[in-house]
Amino acid sequence: MESNHKSGDGLSGTQKEAALRALVQRTGYSLVQENGQRKYGGPPPGWDSTPPERGCEIFIGKLPRDLFEDELIPLCEKIGKIYEMRLMMDFNGNNRGYAFVTFSNKQEAKNAIKQLNNYEIRTGRLLGVCASVDNCRLFVGGIPKTKKREEILSEMKKVTEGVVDVIVYPSAADKTKNRGFAFVEYESHRAAAMARRRLLPGRIQLWGHPIAVDWAEPEVEVDEDTMSSVKILYVRNLMLSTSEEMIEKEFNSIKPGAVERVKKIRDYAFVHFSNREDAVEAMKALNGKVLDGSPIEVTLAKPVDKDSYVRYTRGTGGRNTMLQGEYTYPLSHVYDPTTTYLGAPVFYTPQAYAAIPSLHFPATKGHLSNRALIRTPSVREIYMNVPVGAAGVRGLGGRGYLAYTGLGRGYHVKGDKREDKLYDLLPGMELTPMNTVSLKPQGIKLAPQILEEICQKNNWGQPVYQLHSAIGQDQRQLFLYKVTIPALASQNPAIHPFIPPKLSAYVDEAKRYAAEHTLQTLGIPTEGGDAGTTAPTATSATVFPGYAVPSATAPVSTAQLKQAVTLGQDLAAYTTYEVYPTFALTTRGDAYGTF
């Protein structure tokens, strides 16, 4: 069997062989090609210390395919001592468009990023350079929401090796449950990579559930000088019912009048202080404290440089994605530090850091223009239904981009033209049970979340969706969800589940329609109305013929329904807030794409 390791010194028969041999002779470094990469140094001659610490490696992307070490090494040598360079190679002898360079210390790596990013290596060819991070953390989706951290940790240790920790976040709606996913940290990148390979879809199930695994987004590192000026706190794990006034009162209790303003989004908030000392004091005093029945986590918000919007990642070069044209943001923003591992970055622009960019969106309901580029979604997006970047991590296939979909009234990144259409459920159609894991959700819909919240308020249990499919008259595969509500099903098993009268060509549309049909059947409006009780109550004999309501059911007012219906609309309203740009609308989903 042919080895991936080239014989000899790795230079025989290569392009620019003479120039490369001259480089090796001048520097004394080794140059060996193996496993699709050409390694220069690592360690360099005379190196008798330990390898450089984490943070000393940079990623260089957008390389001309016929550029090699004889041009790249002299450029990097001007900045600092090179410990190692790894140039990714194709079988045809060209490079793959990117390389990794490890310097002897962090400061040299930082200088290299500043000096080499957008450096014109050849006429009209600009390099893309950013920090490189060895990722040791995996995203695992498909975890039952009832499982606790200790159970997940124990289970992951059974099926993979090298597990160090598990990070689990509570549901925004129910703090006793998790969000349906977890982040598993391993002792090394190699251990994480081996675990990811072992956990490929279909190989292993957890608690009888199929799972999806992908690399987690690495935390954005901000230099100490920048962090030393931050006076905004990020507060997470709040109750949905916790108000901005309550948060402001709690943080002002440390020092009255210290808080300038508070902005709460779902279950997290940003607290602005007039000076940094007060912010740090409040963080130390309130981190871990129980507020409104939930222990909160308080950290400093992380300012992110504009270069964080254009990520160059390990993997096939040239697929990095950026916001262009009307959707560029030339100024610095602030980064939500925990959505690093929750799927969608949340940025905002406090006046202390930047002015508000001029935003323009289409005037009519529809798609964004192709100024905003996109890539194929990862399994995290399929499970969480929000875009997830994975920048600067090992082996992620160049998948860096800024998440900004979910803009309220139907704004999505432009893709294939899609026509919303429902199909009649005709006699003789055969409905076949299906599994949703292998199907890609198309967008975030609101009706399923409304139904879930109504069921929670009335103690009916979690709605159960069962996917079926049928072949239409035009030979298209059509989908239909049957919906079962546990409490009602136990009372009326003969007429359950709820079956909508139409099928859809899209899975997410079928789920939305099934939820809407269920709400309509229950007599619950999905849009606002006058004051009064519209949801089932204990004083109502039935919500519709044949369905009795449990006597312990709590009343749900129109105002509460309207609040549930407008969760997504509230997100869109943040575009008008003085310091929140539109792309902050992609706040995290509670589980698999539900807000």
From Swiss-Prot:
Entry keyword annotation includes Kinase: no
Ranges for region Required for nuclear localization: 360-409
GO function terms (MF aspect): enzyme-substrate adaptor activity; RNA binding; single-stranded RNA binding
Pfam families attached to this UniProt entry: DND1_DSRM (PF14709), RRM_1 (PF00076)
Segments forming domain RRM: 56-134, 136-218, 231-303
PANTHER family membership: HETEROGENEOUS NUCLEAR RIBONUCLEOPROTEIN
Domain notes: The RRM domains are necessary but not sufficient for binding to APOB mRNA. Additional residues in the pre-RRM and C-terminal regions are required for RNA-binding and for complementing APOBEC1 activity.
Protein's name in the database: APOBEC1 complementation factor
Top-level taxonomy: Eukaryota, Metazoa, Chordata, Craniata, Vertebrata
